[in-house]
Amino acid sequence: AAAWVLAGRTIIRPQLKNPLPEGGLRDIQRILIAWVAPLLLAGPLASRDVYSYLMQGAMVRDGFDPYTEGAAVNPGPFLLEVSQDWRNTTTPYGPLHLWIGELVTSLVGDNVTAGVVIYKVLSLLGFIAIAWSIPRIARKLGADPAVALWLGVANPVIILHLIGGMHNESLMVGLVSSGLLAALHQRFHAALILVGTAVAMKATAVIAAPFIVWMMLHHYAPKGSSKWRQLAVFVLSGIAAVAEIIAAVALITWVSGTSWGWLSQVSGNSKVINPLAGPTLATDIIFPAVQIFMPDASYNAILAVLRSIAMACMLIGLVAVWWLCRKDNRDAIMGTAAAYQVAFVFNAVTLPWYYASIFTLMGTFRPPLWLIKFTTGVALFIGVSFSGDGNHQLYNWFWVIGMIVVAWFAIQWIFEGVPKKRQPE
């Protein structure tokens, strides 16, 4: 995190003050390689999820169904590495996730180390796709590719959790980023197939699809087109998006030999409680006050109610963001990031690596300086709040307040003297 701040001060600050074409991009690329390289030799950091991935793949390999059975039904070396919390839970991930796991475990047998190495390679491939796509998206939208790469890819949350933690977000976000880039180049079929493939990895990828529909509308019915043409293009684009994404998922489901059981598990688990999720944060604030008047009140009961309310708010928020971000391609990319933010704020469970879907896009759509600063602060705060063993400090108020102060001073130092209008809105 400290190195990221220093890179912001020495490379990004001068570029924001006096923009040069492609200025600072090569420096950030070299720094990114230097930061990622040591992590390629490291074991899982900040999470043990990769062992669950291996376990789920071994279950499919051995004839079990991870959508209806927990890991405990298939004892072996992988199970010993799975957290106790997840040994009796089903998986919410899609058929591509299980297919990859089956292929990996079929290749390595029950060798845990070899399996982890292969997942490290897969996470690196996803990360490379992100690092390749994001500057190109920024360039296409007239934003600064160096700023986009520093803010969205080199930040500590992305590197720690996608490379260090080896989360399947790496492949999912890599596919979505590549799909959005394809859409900006009017390769809409490729874009939808890429997003559909990402959905087969993790369902949240589908959030990007409605914004690709706006891009299709702008291309096939540009400004000045008749209302009837716009309506026809909109309807046909929507139908094409739904059909192609379903086709991609169906093909992967069929080829992998898995099932559609993930649709019933897509809401995920509710065991994780941390204030990154809005319903949990609201419960943490409300519960002490409720206890004053209702000493027997249950934290979990209040949380369950707020999670239900938050789900309704999420649906309303997603529709609102989609509708408001319809003007042009820049709006569509900005809306994709905003929609992911809405989803994760109101989701029942939010973990730090979920923010990869948001952070990666934040520098691509010519964000105003205040938004760059805010994103920098959030990335710093989240990046240092989770330790290498996966525990967090979000209920340590001295830590929280201290890190907010540190993040604020870091932001002032990084962006000292940068004019507000230098990064156009």
Positions of predicted regions on the chain:
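Specific aromatic-rich, kink-prone transmembrane helix
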Residues: 129-133, 172-187, 340
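Transmembrane-helix motifs of polytopic, lipid-linked glycan transferases
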Residues: 2-12, 117-141, 173-174, 316-322
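Perimembrane helix-loop-helix junctions
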Residues: 208-246
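Transmembrane-helix signature of polytopic, membrane-embedded enzymes
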Residues: 22-30, 134-155, 330
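Intramembrane catalytic core of multi-pass membrane enzymes that act on lipidic substrates
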Residues: 21-124
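Aromatic-enriched
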Residues: 366-425
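Start-transfer (signal-anchor) and selected internal transmembrane alpha helices
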Residues: 1-38, 328, 333-334, 414-425
